[in-house]
Swiss-Prot record:
Cofactor(s) needed for function: Mg(2+); Zn(2+)
Annotated pathway: Amino-acid biosynthesis; L-histidine biosynthesis; L-histidine from 5-phospho-alpha-D-ribose 1-diphosphate: step 3/9
Family designation: Belongs to the PRA-CH family.
Catalyzed reaction equations: 1-(5-phospho-beta-D-ribosyl)-5'-AMP + H2O = 1-(5-phospho-beta-D-ribosyl)-5-[(5-phospho-beta-D-ribosylamino)methylideneamino]imidazole-4-carboxamide
Role summary: Catalyzes the hydrolysis of the adenine ring of phosphoribosyl-AMP.
Classification via Pfam families: PRA-CH
UniProt-recorded name of the protein: Phosphoribosyl-AMP cyclohydrolase
Cofactor: record remark: Binds 1 Mg(2+) ion per subunit.
Chief location: cytoplasm
Cellular-component GO terms for this entry: cytoplasm
Root EC class: hydrolase
Residues the record lists as binding Mg(2+): 84, 86, 88
Gene: hisI
Length: 140
């Protein structure tokens, strides 16, 4: 697609869902660019996201729509949506309220590999108590 060809193209006309009807969605902090999470969207969740401007995903484990923040209050206000060159991955840039991670961290990518190439260390801040919010331990 040439740069000038994108003007009248609609996202829902070009998006390429996989054989299961899903597309990966990378979510970044709108202001810092920090990667917050990777989730999946189906047609319905993408349509909800476009309409409501709040991130809505498809839960593969529960097989249902997942409005991020509906349980925790940690909503993601969608500021920008991009699609990659193959139209098979979505990028959401959001204003994150609270933490994105269900275990209480700001980002789901809260562990990093150390220089020994095997040890993990915490590299993010805990922003809420998952047991208090969800009523059970979600730590992994």
């Amino acid at each position: 697609m040439k740069e000038s060809e994108g003007i009248d193209v609609k996202l829902m006309d070009i998006v390429r869902f996989d054989k299961n009807g899903l597309i990966p969605a990378i979510t970044q902090d709108y202001e810092t660019g920090k990667v917050l999470m990777l989730a999946y969207m189906n047609k319905e969740s993408l349509e909800v996201t476009l309409k409501e401007r709040k991130a809505c995903y498809w839960s593969r484990s529960r097989q249902e729509l997942w409005l991020k923040g509906a349980t925790s209050g940690n909503f993601q206000e969608v500021m920008q949506i991009s699609i990659d060159c193959d139209a098979d991955a979505i990028l959401l840039k959001v204003k994150q309220k609270g933490g994105a991670c269900h275990v209480g961290y700001y980002s789901c990518f809260y562990r990093q590999v150390e220089n020994d190439n095997s040890s993990l260390s915490i590299c993010d801040k805990l922003v809420f108590d998952a047991e208090e919010v969800y009523g059970k331990s979600n730590k992994k």
